[in-house]
Amino acid sequence: MPISPIWPAATAVNAEGSIEFHGRTAESLLDEFGSPLYLIDTDEVVARARHFVRAAAEAFDTSTTHVSFAGKAFLSKEVVRLVTEAGMFVDTCTMGEMKIALAAGVPGRRLVLHGNNKSDEEIALAIEQGFAKIVIDEPDEPERVAAIARRLGKRARVMLRVTVGVHAGGHEYISTAHEDQKFGVPLLAAGADAAVLDVLNALKDVTPAATNARISATHSPENGAEKTEKSERELHYDVKYPYDLSHEEVSDTDKALAAAMEAIADGPSIAVLKIILANQDVLELVGAHSHIGSNIHDAEAFIHAAKRMMLLRKTLWATDAYILPEIDLGGGYSVAYTDGEDSMDIDVELTRLADAVNSTNRALGMPA
């Protein structure tokens, strides 16, 4: 009979009381392979990987989605082959993990390099192998990556890890006081009041049809005067005042949104993104990344963080006319460790997250 839901489906207790794994008793496996013995149910790994990839694609059905396996969970060449064949990318954060993934025959374009203390050798290997992303984790890292890329005569694809001030997981609830995390670059400047970002909870969604109508009206040839007026307003990229409201009456929500964008524009993340953009000859800015915790049971904290990431994306568009093509919303989706715990319902919670991301982008007038 099955042991409990937290065990792989192919694990059972037989009539004699022995644990069986795919029909083999624990005793026979120990006799053959010795102890300690680690068993990986590859059928379970592949099924879960495919489920996550499919759930993400279905939830974010108007966008291209990539799901990554965290190498720190467990990494071997066979596991790398299994998860990449199931459609996943692989996150690495040490030279050893990088070499294991490459030795498995996976091309660099399916690999990501993370880490807050990368060596020059790790950065060089990621650039040489054409990694999908090198995730920038600290303010001085773009210049290091740029220098190595110039030496190699190559262009590196980079993404900035942002500390958005949201933390969740385990027994902790959402907190907005985690700008001192050791990973990533803060969204807001030290001492800034994170309450300025609360305006995101007041944004009103607009229907895609209304958004399209507004865009059509702005760019329609028969509305030349309107086009000129709106273009001047929408192309106002002043760094200090990224959201110009001086020429028309605006709502309190719009004023609060302008204040939030100004706070982000003055923050460390935008400053580092500007450094990356200043090195576009050797650095391709592909997006921004956040990670808010581990063992998170529902989408609420992810939604909170995602809204801030969407506003960062809007702010960079306003200050530098650059739309981040990719936003990585991080991992930490819960799995049950004991019989009394629940795993996150991936299908339900990813749909909630996707709906929040899409509605926020529509409210901000940004593409998906």
Where do the protein language model's features map onto the residues?
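Alpha-helix N-cap and loop-to-helix initiation/capping positions
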Residues: 118, 137-140, 178-187, 252, ...
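Acidic, His- and aromatic-enriched active-site or binding-groove loops in soluble protein domains
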Residues: 159-161, 179-193, 353
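A charged N-terminal "starter" segment
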Residues: 1-157, 172, 178, 194-215, ...
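Short beta-strand segments
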Residues: 70, 157-163, 289-291, 328-330
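Active-site-proximal loop/turn and secondary-structure-junction residues that shape catalytic pockets
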Residues: 73-75, 96, 117-119, 138-140, ...
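Structured alpha-helical segments in the cores of large, soluble enzyme domains
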Residues: 48, 101, 114, 120, ...
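C-terminal active-site-proximal or functional interface alpha/beta core segments in diverse enzymes
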Residues: 292-368
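Gly/Ser/Thr-enriched, mixed-charge loops and adjacent short helices
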Residues: 278-298
